[in-house]
C-alpha cells in the first residue's frame, strides 16, 4: 500500500501538509515526498512493490502535469510497450508511471481502460484540471473534504484530513472528480442482462477467470504471502497460487488459544498444498489490548468489521515483524458475489441479486476497508483476487437463480468449479464460518463480556443516547463508537449503517451481524 494526499490551495503550509501525510506513514514507509505544484500541494508515501529503484518514487511529473497513485495496474507491461511505440519514454519499472501517458491518450476515458485497483490524484496543467479517481470496487481507499477556506483535499485515509476538513467523505467508488464535479464512470454491480452460458461453461469461466485473477496478482518485485483461514475462499486463492508458482507458498493463520476453528482447517490446507505455514496464537488479553488500536486504524464503528479485523490485524503485525513479505493475497469479496449464510433466505432470485449489488457497492466500508487497514497499517499490500474486475463482472452476469442456495450448499457454483485436485473435499465442501468466529468463538464472547462489565445499564442508556446517527444498541457497539469518536470526532457518517443481514427477509431479523445467530448456521464453525 501507499499513501496519497492532495490539497487544491495555497493557504496550507508545506510543514502542516507533511504532518498530515505522515499520519499514515505506515502505508508508505520507504520514502515520502511533498511537491509544490500549480494547483497546491501533492504528497506521496511509498511502499515499493513494483519498480523498486528511486526512479519509481512519486509524484510522477511530465512538465507541470503530475500524478500520485496508490494502486496496482495489472498487465501494465504490454500497455507500456504500446506507449513506448507511441514515443513515450519511461525512467522506472513502476506500473504507475504509465498513468500520465495513458491520460494523454484517452483523457478521462482512461479509467475505463484500466485493469487495476487504484486511488489517484492527477493534475492537467494545460486544462488546469485537478482530477481524482477511485477503482470500481474501492479496494484502494480515498477520502475527500473541504478546508475552512473552501479548498478540496483528497487523502488515502480519513485520519489524513482530521483537523483540516470539518466533514470527511468517502470518495465514491468507480468515480472520478474533475473540475468540481464527481462522475460515475463504472457501476460494476450493475448487470444490464444475464449471460446465457450453460452450466458447464459457467463453471469453466468461473474457474478460469478466478485463476487469472490470482495469477496476475502474483506479479511483484517483493515477496508474496497468503492469509489462510481454512475456509473456502482463502483456500482457493492459496491452491491456485500454489499451482501457478510450482513451489511452496508461505501461508499464515491465526486463532484463539482455546477454540480456534481456523487453525485446524488451515493446517489441513497448508499440508495438502505443501505450504510453508505459520500459525499465530492469541488470547483474551491480546485481543482486548489490541481493540483500541484496531478501531483507530480502521476508522469505523461497525461491529462486524471491528470483530473481524482484530485477528487480521494481529496476524499481519506478525508478518510485518518477522518476515520479508510485502504483498498478501486474501479471500475477500467471494461472499458478496456468491452469497452469505443469510442469503439462503433470499425470497427470490431478484432479491438475491439486489442484495449482492448492494453489498458490492458498500464493500469499501466493510470487508475491503478491513483488509486494507489491517494490512496497510503493517506496511504490507493487500491483493484481492475475488475482486478482479473481469471475474466480478462475469459472476454478476450469472442468472441469480443459479447462485441461490438451491443445492443445499452455499456457494455451490464456486465449489463445483474447483472440483478435482485443487483442495481436499472436506475443505471444498465445508460449511462457511464467520471469520471472527473461526478465529475462535471465545474472541467475540470475550469482547462482549468486557463491554458488559465496562458500562452499567444506566451508563449505557445515557451514553448511547448521545448519538442520533446510528445509535449504539448494545454495550459492545457503544464501546466501539466511543473509541471511534475519540479518533474521528463527528465523522460517524462516513459509514452508512451497521452491517447486518437483510432484516426484511425471513429468519434474518437479528440484532447481531454474526452468522452464528442464524438458524441455518448448523455445523458452520465446527
PLM features per residue range, with description:
Residues 1-300, 322, 326:
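Cysteine-centered catalytic environments shared across enzyme families
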Residues 60, 117, 121, 302-313, ...:
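Short, basic, helix/turn surface patches
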Residues 13, 92-95, 114, 199-206, ...:
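Hydrophobic (often cysteine-bearing) scaffold residues that line and stabilize catalytic clefts
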Residues 33-36, 112-116, 167-172, 219-224, ...:
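Short coil/turn segments at secondary-structure boundaries
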Residues 1, 19, 324-330, 342, ...:
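Adenosyl-5′-phosphate
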Residues 258-316, 322, 339-353, 373-374, ...:
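ATP-dependent adenylate-handling ligase core
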Residues 335:
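Cytosolic ligand/metal-binding cores
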Amino acid at each position: 500500500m501507499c499513501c496519497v494526499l492532495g490539497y487544491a490551495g495555497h493557504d496550507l503550509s508545506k510543514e502542516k501538509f507533511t504532518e498530515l501525510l505522515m499520519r499514515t506513514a505506515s502505508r508508505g514507509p520507504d520514502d515520502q515526498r511533498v511537491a509544490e505544484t500549480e494547483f497546491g500541494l501533492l504528497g506521496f508515501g511509498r511502499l515499493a512493490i513494483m519498480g523498486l529503484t528511486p526512479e519509481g518514487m512519486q509524484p510522477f511529473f511530465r512538465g507541470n502535469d503530475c500524478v500520485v497513485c496508490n494502486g496496482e495496474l495489472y498487465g501494465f507491461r504490454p500497455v507500456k510497450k504500446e506507449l513506448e511505440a507511441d514515443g513515450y519514454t519511461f525512467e522506472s519499472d513502476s506500473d504507475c508511471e504509465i498513468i500520465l501517458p495513458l491520460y494523454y491518450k484517452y483523457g478521462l476515458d482512461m479509467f475505463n481502460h484500466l485493469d487495476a485497483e487504484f486511488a489517484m490524484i492527477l493534475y492537467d496543467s494545460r486544462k488546469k484540471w485537478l482530477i481524482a479517481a477511485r477503482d470500481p470496487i474501492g479496494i484502494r481507499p480515498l477520502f475527500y473534504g473541504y478546508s475552512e477556506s473552501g479548498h478540496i483535499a483528497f487523502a488515502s485515509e480519513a485520519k489524513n484530513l482530521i483537523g483540516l476538513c470539518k466533514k470527511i467523505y468517502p470518495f465514491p467508488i468507480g468515480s472520478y472528480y474533475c473540475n468540481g464535479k464527481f462522475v460515475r464512470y463504472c457501476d460494476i454491480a450493475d448487470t444490464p442482462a444475464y449471460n446465457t452460458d450453460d452450466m458447464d461453461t459457467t463453471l469453466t469461466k468461473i474457474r478460469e477467470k478466478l485463476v487469472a485473477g490470482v495469477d496476475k496478482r502474483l506479479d511483484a518485485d517483493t515477496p508474496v504471502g497468503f492469509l489462510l483461514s481454512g475456509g473456502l475462499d482463502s483456500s482457493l486463492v492459496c491452491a491456485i497460487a500454489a499451482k501457478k508458482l510450482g513451489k511452496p507458498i508461505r501461508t499464515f493463520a491465526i486463532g484463539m488459544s482455546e477454540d480456534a476453528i481456523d487453525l485446524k482447517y488451515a493446517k489441513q490446507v497448508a499440508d495438502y498444498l505443501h505450504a510453508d505455514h505459520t500459525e499465530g496464537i492469541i488470547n483474551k488479553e491480546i485481543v482486548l489490548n489490541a481493540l483500541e488500536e484496531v478501531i483507530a486504524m480502521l476508522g469505523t464503528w461497525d461491529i462486524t468489521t471491528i470483530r473481524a479485523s482484530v485477528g487480521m490485524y494481529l496476524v499481519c503485525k506478525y508478518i510485518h515483524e518477522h518476515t520479508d513479505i510485502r504483498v498478501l493475497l486474501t479471500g475477500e469479496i467471494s461472499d458478496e458475489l456468491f452469497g452469505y449464510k443469510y442469503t439462503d433466505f433470499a425470497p427470490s432470485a431478484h432479491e438475491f441479486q439486489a442484495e449482492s449489488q448492494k453489498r458490492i457497492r458498500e464493500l469499501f466500508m466493510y470487508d475491503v476497508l478491513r483488509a486494507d487497514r489491517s494490512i496497510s497499517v503493517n506496511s504490507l499490500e493487500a491483493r484481492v483476487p475475488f475482486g478482479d474486475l473481469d471475474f466480478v463482472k462475469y459472476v454478476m452476469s450469472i442468472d441469480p437463480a443459479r447462485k441461490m442456495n438451491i443445492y443445499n450448499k452455499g456457494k455451490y457454483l464456486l465449489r463445483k468449479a474447483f472440483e478435482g485436485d485443487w483442495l481436499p473435499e472436506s475443505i471444498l465442501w465445508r460449511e462457511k464460518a464467520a471469520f471472527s468466529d473461526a478465529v475462535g468463538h471465545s474472541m467475540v464472547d470475550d469482547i462482549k463480556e468486557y463491554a458488559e462489565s465496562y458500562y452499567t445499564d444506566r451508563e449505557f442508556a445515557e451514553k448511547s443516547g448521545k448519538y442520533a446517527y446510528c445509535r449504539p444498541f448494545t454495550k459492545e457497539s457503544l464501546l466501539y463508537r466511543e473509541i471511534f469518536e475519540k479518533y474521528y470526532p463527528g465523522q460517524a457518517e462516513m459509514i452508512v449503517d451497521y452491517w447486518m443481514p437483510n432484516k426484511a427477509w425471513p429468519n434474518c431479523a437479528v440484532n447481531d451481524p454474526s452468522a452464528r445467530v442464524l438458524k441455518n448456521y448448523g455445523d458452520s464453525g465446527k
